[in-house]
Design a protein with these regions (language model features):
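OB-fold nucleic-acid-binding modules
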Residues: 1-32, 58-61, 79-101
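Beta-strand secondary-structure signal
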Residues: 14-18, 40-42, 51, 69-71
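OB-fold (S1/OB) nucleic-acid-binding surfaces
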Residues: 24-52
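Generic beta-strand structural signal
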Residues: 39, 50, 66-68, 80-84
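Short nucleic-acid-contacting surface segments enriched for D/E, G, S/T with interspersed K/R
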Residues: 56-71
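Short, charged beta-turn/beta-strand-edge "cap" motif at the junction between a beta-strand
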Residues: 73-78
Length: 101
């Protein structure tokens, strides 16, 4: 699916693109009491870009200019902007990892 076609509340969404931004990771306290790292990246295709929340060990694998594919995610709105989220069943595939940071 093209990024420009994404809408709030979509489920089971697959997108692909290039990572154009990787934010600082931060610790988030979960309802279970555990703490998990999360960061926001931006993924861009030829139709647009979207923020994506990346959790845990996936953070270390993502670099700027990496070509990735995200599967089984969902779209929600946060601060009047849609964003892509990888849920429990979501998958991240790195198709091409750039050495550029």
């Amino acid at each position: 699916m093209r990024i420009s076609e994404l809408q709030n509340d979509q489920k089971n969404v697959n997108i692909g693109g290039v990572v154009t931004y990787v934010g600082q990771s931060r610790d988030v306290s979960l309802k279970s009491g555990s703490v998990e790292k999360v960061t926001t990246i931006t993924v861009q295709d030829d139709s647009g870009s979207i923020p994506v929340n990346i959790w845990g060990s996936m953070i270390e694998k993502i670099k700027i200019n990496s070509e990735i594919r995200l599967e089984k995610g969902y779209i929600n709105e946060f601060r009047n902007q849609i964003q892509f989220n990888l849920g429990y069943y979501g998958k991240l595939f790195i198709l091409l990892n750039s050495n550029t940071e």
